[in-house]
Amino acid sequence: MRRLFAVVLAACLWLGFAPQASADVAGLTPCSESPRFIQRAEAAATPQAKARFENYSQALCGADGLPHLIVDGRLDHAGDFIIPSLLFLYIAGWIGWVGRSYLQAIKSDKDAAGKEIVIDVPLAVKFSLTGFAWPLAAFQEFSSGKLLAKADEITVSPR
């Protein structure tokens, strides 16, 4: 029984792993060589559209002639996905950090609920202008212990 289990396990592991897929062999071609892309580029009417097609001619296109986003971790496509996603995470963190700071600042106010609904614009602008350094501020609060709540401050559900 052990040998049968070992053989079945070995077969599942051996057959279960798929070879690494690469976009270069997945039917994608450089857009500058794609007939459908060239047809679309020639049909562009405005100078802005022609410039856009010129920029996209360096990307990889499918059979439909449309550029595809390559998200496989190779650094030659870093400008396509990694850099914009890091920028998105930075901006989302900025917004979250500014909102958190604003809520902490109005918490001690007598009309805190009102200031959550009707935002105190000068105070919010003050926090939004200092929010660009949120990664450093978050690291500072984490290392000092102010970022995380203490265990006795966290309520436990009675279920």
UniProtKB/Swiss-Prot annotation:
<keyword id="KW-0602">Photosynthesis</keyword>
<dbReference type="GO" id="GO:0015979">
    <property type="term" value="P:photosynthesis"/>
</dbReference>
<dbReference type="InterPro" id="IPR036577">
    <property type="entry name" value="PSI_PsaF_sf"/>
</dbReference>
<dbReference type="Pfam" id="PF02507">
    <property type="entry name" value="PSI_PsaF"/>
</dbReference>
<keyword id="KW-0603">Photosystem I</keyword>
<comment type="similarity">
    <text>Belongs to the PsaF family.</text>
</comment>
<dbReference type="InterPro" id="IPR003666">
    <property type="entry name" value="PSI_PsaF"/>
</dbReference>
<comment type="function">
    <text>Probably participates in efficiency of electron transfer from plastocyanin to P700 (or cytochrome c553 in algae and cyanobacteria). This plastocyanin-docking protein contributes to the specific association of plastocyanin to PSI.</text>
</comment>
<protein>
    <recommendedName>
        <fullName>Photosystem I reaction center subunit III</fullName>
    </recommendedName>
</protein>
<feature type="signal peptide">
    <location>
        <begin position="1"/>
        <end position="23"/>
    </location>
</feature>
<dbReference type="GO" id="GO:0009538">
    <property type="term" value="C:photosystem I reaction center"/>
</dbReference>
<keyword id="KW-0732">Signal</keyword>
